[in-house]
Amino acid sequence: RNIRKPLIVMSPKSLLRHKLVVSNLGEMGPRTHFHRVLGEHDRLVLDKKIRRVILCSGKVYYDLLQERRIREINDVAIVRVEQLYPFPWQGLVQQLGRYPHAEVVWCQEEPANMGAWFFVNQRINAILRDFGHQSECVAYVGRRGAASPATGLLSRHVEQQKWIVDQALSGELDKLALPHQRPKY
């Protein structure tokens, strides 16, 4: 698209001074453009040896990145979906094509019925199916569906957030709860 529009960023305050949330001028200066999908930037094992690809959008990326670096996990790639609509088909095909033997996980911190999961689920599955990816379908890691966006207790929120990051990075896919089931935090 050759249309230039103002960018409106809606972000939690926790990202304003986060040490990982930085961009240099070369990434946003003249002759640059918005990237709908951002691939892996860290040095990991060879693409064909990546065990898991985590797709995510928003603040949870920084939680995943920070924990992956702390644990020194080098066989899990994190791909950011920066624009959900129109859906970035080409960008995701390109990124998922880099990791043909990896498990594919969608991770979000919002409850399943409030985040992007119900929008991206079938679209990501179509990509996996149409391009013969080894993963048959994308797995969900996040909070179960809920009537309220917040748990109401900071301690419970922290516990759930830790569980989400842990499951996304190293959880066994066959033991993950479905979005409508109650996970064991």
Sequence positions of predicted segments:
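Peripheral docking tails and interdomain loops at the edges
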Residues: 1, 7-16, 108-185
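Active-site phosphate/pyrophosphate-binding segments
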Residues: 1-60
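Short coil/turn connectors at secondary-structure junctions
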Residues: 2-6, 49-51, 73-75, 101-102, ...
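Short acidic, glycine/serine/threonine-rich loops at helix termini
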Residues: 18-24, 65-67, 91, 116-119, ...
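A short, gly/pro- and small-residue-rich
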Residues: 24-33, 72-75, 116-132
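Charge-patterned, long linear interaction tracts outside catalytic cores
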Residues: 50-52, 56-58, 64-65, 180-185
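Generic long, charged, amphipathic alpha-helical segments
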Residues: 61, 65-100, 137
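Glycine-rich, anion-gripping cofactor-binding loops and their flanking helix/strand elements
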Residues: 85-104, 108-119, 153
